[in-house]
Amino acid sequence: MSAPEPRQHNGETPEEAQAAGREILAIIGQLRQLVDGHERRSKIQPVKNSEMATDDEVTHPDRLSHLTSSYLNSANDHCRALLTLLDDGNGGLSILIVALHSHIRAIIEHAALTSWLLSPSDPHERRRRALAAISSELTFEKQLVSSINQGRPPETREQRSTRAKATRDANRRDRTRQKTLKAAAKACGIADDEYSAGLPKWSEILDDASTSSTRFRGGFLPKTIWMLTSGLTHPSASRVMLVAAMQETRDYGNGTLQVEVTARIGSLVAPLRTATSMLEDAIDWERYRKAKVAEH
């Protein structure tokens, strides 16, 4: 009597894998076009009297364009890393089970935040969101300094003096930045409590970005994909199974199986497509605000 065929779990047929591979190659082509055009796009300055130029002027020195260009630069950086990981060096695909999702998540977050900042038609709301983003960054910087100070205690008088000076300098920078932020808010007619709490939750940012999108039209997909990629960025045994295929290689006869875990190629299609579409949305919003003349 022949041994039973080893069972597959959560697998895909060769035809399904090939179809998914073709879709991934097409998305990679889109990503490469975005990466290749990034440097050219990043050098385009806002048109005089455009909405972005006007936003920058009234919030100076905390410019909205500084935030969005930084976010798109970072998204492009993750795109380049993603393309490198996907290339097996022989003209084919290299599909890692988990590592790709960390970069996909980062692209989604940078793109969503860019769209969240730029999509409101009301200039007051765009500026309020920009100040909220800056407030969040200042809070992080302060927490980082505090974390450093809670590390290994200084052992010598010189070390204590150096740390104390670094803390004073950091606090001075924070006070200066907070004062500048308040002045910008006042110039925009924005109350402190409208921005000082910082950014909303990522789920709210993603909902807003997908609602303003011409590609998703408020669909659930961006937030769902973000939740998946976030889950795969953190340690988890069960979440890996959502994107993996398992092939039984040995049955120990006591309820224990040995399995080989491989990437399920089809599970990468929706995350890649979502990240690419969200980045295209963000690029469209930046182009639009740089070109559209502000109404006075």
Tell what function each PLM region has:
Residues 90-94, 123-124, 128, 211-219:
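Intrinsically disordered, low-complexity coil segments
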Residues 97-150:
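Internal, hydrophobic cores of structured domains that mediate oligomerization or house catalytic pockets
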Residues 2-66, 138-296:
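Secondary-shell segments that build the walls of catalytic and ion/ligand-binding clefts
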Residues 90, 122-123, 244, 290:
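Residue-level detector of alpha-helical recognition elements and their boundaries
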Residues 74, 78-88, 136-143, 228-232:
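Solvent-exposed, amphipathic alpha-helical segments
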Residues 55-119:
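Long, hydrophobic/aromatic-enriched structural stretches that serve as scaffold segments
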